[in-house]
C-alpha cells in the first residue's frame, strides 16, 4: 500500500470463551499504521508476535484490519494465515492456514461496530468461531487506537 499513513498506538483486548473452560483473555499494546481510506473507512496494520507453545519459537504475523460502518475485515499473514469478515448477523466461511495444514473455519458475527475518529478510534467484535464444522468458541475483540496528536489516551485496561 503506497498511501500515506499515520503512526498509531494500539491497545487490543481479545477474549475467548470455550465450553466448560475458563475465559482466555489476551491483551497487548503495540504500534501500527493507520490509513484513512475515506470518511467512514480506514485500515490499521501492525505486527503480532506470539510464542509457539511447543517449540518456544517466536512467530510473527502481519495483521491488517479494514473497517467501515458496515464491515470489518481481519487479514493475517505469516505462519498462521487467514481472512475473516465480520458484518452484523452474517456468517463468513474461510480457510485457516497453519504450518500443520489447512482447516475450514467459519465466523458468525453477533456484534460488529467501529468508530473512526481523526485522532483516535475503536472497533468491537463479538462472534462465534467454528473450526472444521465444529463450534470452537465465542470470541470478543476490542481494539482502541490513537495517534500521537490525539488528546485522548489509550486506556491501559479495557472494560468488557
Question: Each PLM stretch: what is its role?
Answer:
Residues 1-93, 97-124, 128-130, 134-135, ...:
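N-terminal intrinsically disordered, cationic/polar leader segments
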Residues 143-145:
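A short acidic/small-residue loop/turn micro-motif
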Amino acid at each position: 500500500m503506497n498511501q500515506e499513513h499515520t503512526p498509531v498506538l494500539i491497545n487490543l483486548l481479545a477474549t475467548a470463551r470455550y465450553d466448560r473452560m475458563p475465559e482466555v483473555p489476551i491483551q497487548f499494546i503495540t504500534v501500527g499504521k493507520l490509513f484513512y481510506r475515506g470518511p467512514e473507512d480506514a485500515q490499521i496494520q501492525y505486527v503480532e508476535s506470539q510464542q509457539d507453545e511447543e517449540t518456544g519459537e517466536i512467530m510473527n504475523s502481519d495483521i491488517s484490519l479494514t473497517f467501515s460502518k458496515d464491515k470489518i475485515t481481519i487479514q493475517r499473514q505469516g505462519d498462521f494465515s487467514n481472512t475473516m469478515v465480520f458484518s452484523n448477523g452474517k456468517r463468513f466461511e474461510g480457510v485457516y492456514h497453519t504450518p500443520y495444514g489447512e482447516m475450514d473455519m467459519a465466523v458468525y458475527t453477533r456484534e460488529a461496530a467501529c468508530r473512526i475518529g481523526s485522532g483516535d478510534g475503536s472497533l468491537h467484535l463479538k462472534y462465534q468461531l467454528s473450526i472444521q464444522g465444529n463450534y470452537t468458541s465465542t470470541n470478543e475483540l476490542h481494539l482502541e487506537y490513537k495517534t500521537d496528536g490525539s488528546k485522548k489516551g489509550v486506556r491501559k485496561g479495557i472494560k468488557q
